[in-house]
Regions:
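Conserved HGGG/HGGXW glycine-rich cap/lid loop of the alpha/beta-hydrolase fold
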Residues: 12, 16-73
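Residue in the alpha/beta-hydrolase core beta-strand immediately N-terminal to the catalytic nucleophile
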Residues: 103-104, 127-130
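Flexible "cap/lid" loop of the alpha/beta hydrolase fold
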Residues: 116-120, 129-157
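Conserved alpha/beta-hydrolase catalytic His-Asp/Glu region
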Residues: 140-146, 155-209
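Catalytic active-site module of serine/aspartate enzymes centered on a nucleophile-bearing elbow/loop
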Residues: 238-284
Length: 284
């Protein structure tokens, strides 16, 4: 299991290198780095590993995936789940891997909070953002956290008092049981919920200070699609792609269309190749 230690914490990391450079094509010997930042609690780097990371690597980028603090196989600490901690963890992992030049961040759901705050805190280290159904931007405090915290609070009660992990393991659902046990330890055994409640949204005035290009991809029926529209209005260089017929599960259920849009955007901004499937995906 590949690991790095950053800020005194063990992080599970996976890296996918691009194919060898082809001198005849003039391919870059130092490929762009694309870092994937996943969502909360039951999510981990595997959600990208089996969807986006492989094709991004095949297109000529170095894909870096890591489990957020307390998630997946990364170390679970009692505290340290604020946005500032997550940003510091991100750059700590990149430093440990030796990636100090600007990188592209691909973020899903809560990962958008990390990516957006990273771009504002260290603009010299972020070359671009891909925000997939991402939380973070909002007009008012509490606008984006209320529903998420209510959902996590209810999940915490089910995990603790109904012993969901034990029930799943008892009927032979080992993977889901292990995920539930990890989620239980995270939401009921750390400061995660309190830290999330204290996170402030990134408001329009701050979004205007985002200097890198942004691709925002949201589902037509998503309950946070307004975050994508806010990004479009407020970020100086933003492309918004609304996926018709989809809700918050764009990454899992709309992978092919998402890849086509994202790979074409990366080709334009990062200089990666455009696979045939992406060229057939239509204009942004």
């Amino acid at each position: 299991m590949p690991e790095v230690t950053a800020r005194g914490i063990r992080f599970h990391v996976q890296t996918m290198d691009p194919p060898p450079a082809d001198p005849a094509r003039g391919a870059a010997s130092d490929p762009p780095v694309v870092v994937f930042v996943h969502g909360l609690v039951v999510d981990d780097l595997s959600s990208f590993y089996y969807t986006l990371a492989g094709p991004v690597s095949a297109a000529g980028a170095r894909a870096v995936l890591y489990d957020l603090r307390g998630h997946g196989r990364s170390e679970r600490t009692p505290a340290g789940y604020s946005a500032a901690d997550a940003v510091a963890d991100l750059f700590g992992v990149l430093d440990a891997l030796g990636h100090r030049r600007p990188v592209y961040l691909v973020a899903n759901s809560f990962g958008g909070v990390v990516a957006l705050n990273a771009a504002l805190a260290r603009p010299e280290r972020v070359a671009g953002l891909v925000m997939i159904e991402s939380y973070g931007p909002a007009e008012r405090a509490g606008e984006w956290t209320e529903n998420m915290l209510n959902t996590l609070g209810k999940s915490a009660l089910v995990l603790e008092y109904e012993r969901l992990a034990d029930q799943l393991l008892a009927i032979g659902w080992r993977q889901r049981g292990r995920q539930a046990r990890t989620a239980d330890a995270l939401v009921n055994g750390t400061s995660l919920l309190d830290d999330l409640a204290a996170i402030e949204p990134v408001r329009p005035a701050d979004l205007a200070a985002v200097t890198c290009p942004v691709l925002a991809v949201y589902g037509e029926h998503s309950d946070i699609v307004d975050a994508g529209r806010l990004l479009l209005r407020s970020v100086p260089e933003c492309t918004l792609h609304i996926m018709s017929g989809h809700a918050h599960t764009v990454l899992r259920e709309g992978t092919e269309q998402l890849l086509a849009v994202m790979l074409r955007w990366l080709a334009h901004h990062a200089g990666t190749r455009v696979p045939v499937m992406a060229m057939a995906g239509g204009a942004l």
